[in-house]
Amino acid sequence: MYPHSKQKKTPVTLLALSIALALQAGAAAAQDAGAAATELDTVTVTGYRASVEKALDIKRGEAGMVDAVVAEDIGKFPDSNLAESLQRIPGVVITRDGGEGRQITVRGLGPDFTRVRINGMEALSTVGSSDGQGGTNRSRGFDFNVFASDLFSQLIARKTASADVEEGSLGATVDLRTARPFDYDGFTLVTNVQTAYNDASQAAMPRFAGLIANSWADGKVGALLSVAYSERETVEEGTGTVRWANARANTPTNTANPKGVGFAGCAEGTAPFPGVCSDQVYTPRFPRYTLMEHDQKRLGVTGSLQFKPSDRTTFSLDMLYSKIDAQRDEKYIEANGLSKTGADGKAQIVVRDGVIENGALVYAKMDNVDIRAENRHDEWSTDFYQVSLDGEHRLTDSFTLSGRVGTSRSKHDNPVQATIMMDKLDVQGYSYDYRGNANKPVFNYGVNPTDPNGWTLSTIRLRQNYVTNEFHNGELDFSWVIGPSFTLSGGVQGKNYSFDSMERRRVGNETAVPNFSTGNKIVPADMTELASLGGLAGSPGTWVVPNFGAIANSSVSSTAKGSTHWSTTRPACAASRSRTAAVG
């Protein structure tokens, strides 16, 4: 519940009250003219209004377009990470992954156009995700879900160019600042413990944040330590299409099929449903149900030491470490044949009935459709650290020197990304229907999706991803206040950036799968498991998928074509690597 207050002001009453107070003050001054003035204690106002005032002060002090979020806002709103804190800035939109904000878009420009500085030093952090959310990040887009929002005291988005901000951003330059001991008055201890319960995953999600700070030697030396830890278990249930494609993408020209128009029979002639042959008709590529289970743990630690030998000089040493560990399981059941352009895919499908709306085949009943069930398992982690030292010295009342030097490193490891697929070929009576609710279509697979018998192993996909980003920064600046309305600033900056990316894949064709011990590729029933949707109306509720553990321990794992061994932890792979270094 947000705090609120109601006030009613009557101008006449307030005027009368102010006149009365003025008369009393005049009388008191006449009676106590010789008395010494009494100094009152300082009254500090905190709360939402105070945080807004601080943000406005930041905006007033900048010549460009700047928006800010300060500590009071960050701490009092339940933002799980930095992206969700930044989305409260006008013009900032976030993308989500696993139920959390991941990247930001500023004024329509995507993550690649936004540059991020932490304590004044440019940095980059990357994570992995499902293919539908962008997969492993090898771009310059910053993944904010590496960091808990509790670790930062100030977020600033600079939306316009400025001479004192180096180039590299068309969208915005986002400045993140961690807390420092001199931000607090003496000894400070703050703790925050929260928990939530997710009824979809049936799991508690604890969250803890703590900060301790103190200063000594009459405020000349200070130290601070903050820690944030959280756990999340989420379940996502839904549907997808993996885009829509032209029904005649493979342009077959066979004669019309009198039993029904198939994608291989799109030609002149009379048929029960000829409309599907139009070049302007689109069909879903992978109409499917989706179940995603995402578990993650995130730890963040900041430390800061400050030294102020005089009123004119301040040194600050800031340290930041964050680690996120995640495990994701994705299970799908889909019509795979609609995406195939070969003879065993779209060309063999026969369309029995359909409905076209606005150029889309929103309902179709088909024969000879391949049905696919797949199971994907990911394990990944990202470690980020940054160390920076900065100092400021006022040589005179009008001339100030400042400088900083630091380094940062983000290391993303995805040692396990394994996908197993199995198909049921040439299924009769398959249908999909997007007419009632395009977000909740109804699929009828023509077979019992929970029956583990008759599935053919079709794909074993084993991949590993590793991405490392490093920054080394240094700068020296000066500021000279020439007059009340004129300040001259300048400086020099050096930056070195290096990028290392590697992807390893299973040797050979991923669709070249070996036989089981039975002598064929039919998946044994005891090497399958069930996936269930809990709350998606109109879905089959449960379907069968490959079982990772059972298949990895079977004869398939030791006879996969092109490799001598594969498992969900250390697949035999071919590697590709890229390196980039930049100096500025």
Where are these regions (language model features)?
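Outer-membrane beta-barrel transmembrane strands
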Residues: 172-178, 194-195, 204-215, 285-330, ...
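N-terminal periplasmic "start-of-domain" segments of outer-membrane beta-barrel proteins
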Residues: 44-77, 103, 121-126, 130-136
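Cleavable N-terminal targeting peptides that direct proteins into the secretory/outer-membrane pathway or into
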Residues: 1-38
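Outer-membrane beta-barrel and related beta-rich outer-membrane complex signature
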Residues: 128-130, 232-244, 284, 316-348, ...
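Outer-membrane beta-barrel translocator/receptor signature
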Residues: 134-142, 150-157, 164-260, 264, ...
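Residue-level detector of the transmembrane beta-barrel scaffold of outer-membrane proteins
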Residues: 115-117, 154, 188-192, 222-224, ...
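Flexible glycine-rich, low-complexity coil/linker segments exposed to the extracellular/periplasmic environment
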Residues: 250-284, 346-369, 430-458, 513-584
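Extracytoplasmic beta-strand/coil segments of soluble accessory domains associated
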Residues: 83-130, 159
